[in-house]
Amino acid sequence: MSTVTSTSVWSRPVTSAQQKYALSTIRGLKKMKDGGPFIYPVDYIALGIPHYPTIVTHPMDLGTIEKKLGGGPKMEQANYPPYNTVDEFIADVRLVFRNCLSFNGPDHVITQMGKNVEEAFNKALKNMPGPEEVSVF
């Protein structure tokens, strides 16, 4: 049997092993020293940045990703559609850091923190389980 090496492997339905690994990865990122600003949705009113939604039109945060992976209270999970593919999960994580860069600019301390967390994500992604091998007869 051969191993699929193309990036299309992440377009397949999420396996149980991938879901568990992704959830563990997100929880690890949230615990990082630099993870704090990315745990919850940006409260732009409390932070006094009312223009935030005009710049960041598709907000995302690690806590929301965790819920979409099945983490957190069951009644909260019902409000978050689960990921169908690993690609969708990866896209949401990348969106967190793209939004950070778009709003804060490249030299802001929060952006630097985001780069550190994203680097840890990239390292963890290298160990993401592949799809369960299927025999073809």
Residue ranges and their predicted role:
Residues M1-A17:
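Eukaryotic intrinsically disordered, low-complexity linkers and tails enriched in Pro/Ser/Thr/Gln/Gly
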